[in-house]
């Protein structure tokens, strides 16, 4: 890439908090690859924080339905264009009805779910289209997760924007719900440290190595520093290694051991994560209307 646009520089600045010239320098070095630029800036200690990385721009709700025996559950993300519609009773009623149908039919995927019949007789897709026509916004069934276990499934909804399901062995529903609440707050990547992807560890090792070399300390000390930071990183992203949100003096793994319980799996959804929403440019909209 021969030139780096001002818009790209601004985007990197918003995400890292670094100066304009630093952002441009790293973008040039990475040929305009913003994600690689962030990694290189972290290595050099320039990125204050990837402030915008976790920001998402999509509206909607998370809904969960669970069977009466607490062994089967489904979770859905259903998107709308605005938060106003996401709070609309027609929208929330539709979302909950779809979750109930998903629990009953356990569809293979969203397409399969769309063909299932609601109590009204209409299919999910027909009801979606009717709702779109009624409220004037696009509505999308974005994703579906099914969970089943021989133990107990606990779930937690933080408002309607974050949802978590946890499958627990040898534990109570109350404990499963507490763990789900912890997952909602602490966002672990995996259950246990052995499940952390090797690629994620290697990426962090490269960053820590680059940072440690700047200290000027002997290689033996640097190696110990890196190992310590890697272990800390693994604990931070592993559910069992995290301090329990209700009692930070103990880790989740210790709590489960005391309760003789085991987390089989968990799933965490947050509305809009991974979706980039087009920002409105009202000046351009008005000018386009004038030109027509």
From Swiss-Prot:
One term of GO molecular function: translation elongation factor activity
Plastid listed as a keyword: no
Classification via InterPro entries: EF-Ts_dimer_sf, Transl_elong_EFTs/EF1B, Transl_elong_EFTs/EF1B_dimer, Transl_elong_Ts_CS, UBA-like_sf
A Pfam entry, by short name: EF_TS
Keyword terms, alphabetized: Cytoplasm, Elongation factor, Protein biosynthesis
Localization: Cytoplasm
Gene Ontology CC terms, in alphabetical order: cytoplasm
Region (Involved in Mg(2+) ion dislocation from EF-Tu): 82-85
Purpose of the protein: Associates with the EF-Tu.GDP complex and induces the exchange of GDP to GTP. It remains bound to the aminoacyl-tRNA.EF-Tu.GTP complex up to the GTP hydrolysis stage on the ribosome.
Similarity-based family: Belongs to the EF-Ts family.
Protein name: Elongation factor Ts
UniProt organism field: Legionella pneumophila subsp. pneumophila (strain Philadelphia 1 / ATCC 33152 / DSM 7513)
